[in-house]
Design a protein with these regions (language model features):
Chain B
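A short acidic Gly-Thr/Ser loop motif
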Residues: 6-12, 75, 161-166, 186
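ATP-binding/phosphotransfer module of carbohydrate and carboxylate kinases, centering on a glycine-rich
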Residues: 18, 22-24, 197-248
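Secondary-structure boundary elements
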Residues: 20, 58-65, 150-159
Length: 67, 248
């Protein structure tokens, strides 16, 4: 992990804000901090499982779209 | 194409029905592998997952014969779940996870094989006190990480932070493979400290409604310098002798 590694922070709004501030206030990390929005983390596990199943060839490409 | 996805954790199970990439119904039950650990039986978990599936199908207006694929991830693949699948060794990305999927018969919840996504563990051998800090594992966060890779188009090395009862920090390399993770008890500690310690009074048994940047960073600095236990007691001291409150 390098100082420029980007952070992607999910979770409840107040936790996302707190964690983002902690990373931004850290002396080691200087990379981008991306805070995930609520729509971006909707049904995350299912979306990921479908994406992996698609990579396995279990469903046609049209069954999943990037949101 | 109609798909059901099952996400079973330690205490909760969530089932979603999808059609053409969109959620059309969902249901959640407060049942997870903790029930298996407590009762010594899988019956509660099986019943809870099956009920969540039936509720989701009902909300979606689907019959069992209209579902083309059932996918499951999370603690359902653990030794306390419904079908154990060994962890995949990091590094593991979309391709490795896809190749390691297992179609398992779990007749207690579904009449056809359920496709299970394995968890991922750090690549550490001969684990002992000397290297336990390097070891860690996940079941469920790997699918969430791959979802964020796809939704956010992550294409550079990254750390994905997934706060929860057991907060995960998932490390990705430039090829979007999971190279490892670090887990903390942060969520559980926050819950216990807020509700079941002397600080419950100072905190009104709740988390801050808004973040005060100065106080947040001061707290983090304090915990780093003098330890979490002492830093926590400072909250009571500030409550007793200053004007600060839960929101600082």
């Amino acid at each position: 992990m390098s100082p420029g590694t980007q952070f992607v922070i999910s979770g409840k709004p107040v936790l996302r804000e707190a964690l983002a501030l902690l990373v931004q206030g850290d002396d080691f990390f200087s990379g981008a901090v991306n805070v995930v929005t609520d729509p971006q983390q909707t049904a995350l596990a299912g979306f990921g499982a479908i994406a992996i199943a698609q990579a396995r060839g279990l469903l046609e490409p049209a069954a999943i779209q990037v949101q | 194409m109609n798909i059901l996805t099952i996400d079973t954790g330690t205490t909760n199970t969530r089932v979603f029905a999808w059609r053409d990439g969109e959620v059309i119904a969902h249901s959640a039950r407060q049942v997870g592998v903790r029930d298996t650990a407590i009762t010594g039986s899988r019956h509660t978990l099986e019943t809870g997952v099956q009920t969540a599936i039936q509720e989701t199908l009902h909300h979606a207006g689907l019959g069992t014969d209209q579902v083309d694929l059932v996918l499951a991830s999370g603690m359902i693949t653990s030794n306390m779940g419904l079908h154990e699948v060994p962890h995949l060794l990091a590094p593991a990305g979309m391709g490795e996870l896809a190749a390691a999927m297992v179609a398992a018969p779990i007749p207690a919840i579904w009449h056809q094989p359920v496709w299970l996504v394995p968890g991922v563990r750090n690549r550490v051998d001969h684990i002992g006190l000397h290297n336990v800090e390097a070891m860690d594992m996940m079941r469920g966060e790997e699918v969430e990480s791959m979802a964020l890779v796809k939704r956010l188009n992550i294409c550079e090395p990254a750390v994905i932070v997934l706060p929860g009862s057991h907060s995960k920090f998932v490390s990705l390399d430039g090829a979007q493979r999971i190279t490892g993770c670090v887990t903390t008890l942060a969520g559980e500690l926050l819950q216990v400290i807020t509700h079941n310690t002397i600080l419950a009074s100072s905190l009104d048994s709740g988390f801050a409604d808004e973040i005060d940047r100065e106080m947040l960073l001061a707290g983090a600095r304090s915990a780093k310098q003098i330890g979490l236990g002492r830093a926590c007691f400072s909250v009571r001291t500030l409550d007793q002798f200053t004007v600060y409150d839960r929101n600082a």
